[in-house]
Regions:
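Feature activates predominantly on carbohydrate-active enzymes
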Residues: 1-119
């Protein structure tokens, strides 16, 4: 996303890869990984949410180490494809459908809240 019209008084322009918020959708796109790797996505009410929910939003299983690896590879690809990009923001969706798998639940209990599973 292009933020070139940012006023110079505030640091000038900058470009963000794949938008400034709610971008799990692009970090680990369900179209690319959902069928083969449903375990990359949030487990809610016994079902893997390997598809967009609430419109375009996606929740990930953040205790799955492969999720971070896939996200990092995708970010690196975006930055290589557009060297003028200044930054990449990582932001979870605003949904109540966070992952409730055993590992994410253990993290939640350890740190005291559901938002801790979105670390």
């Amino acid at each position: 996303r292009d933020y070139r019209n940012k006023d110079e008084r505030h640091g000038g322009c900058f470009r963000i890869a794949k938008g400034p918020a709610h971008n799990y959708r692009w970090l680990v796109a369900p179209e690319a990984y959902g069928a083969q790797h449903p375990e990359y996505y949030a487990l809610d009410d016994g079902k893997r949410l390997n598809y967009p929910i609430r419109g375009n939003e996606v929740e990930l299983c953040l205790s799955n180490p492969n999720v971070a690896q896939v996200a990092a590879e995708n970010i690196a690809g975006w930055l290589r494809a557009d060297p003028d990009t200044d930054m990449c923001f990582i932001g979870q969706s605003d949904t109540p459908s966070y992952c409730k798998c055993d590992n994410c639940e253990a993290t939640r209990k350890r740190y005291g809240g559901w938002d801790s599973t979105r670390r």
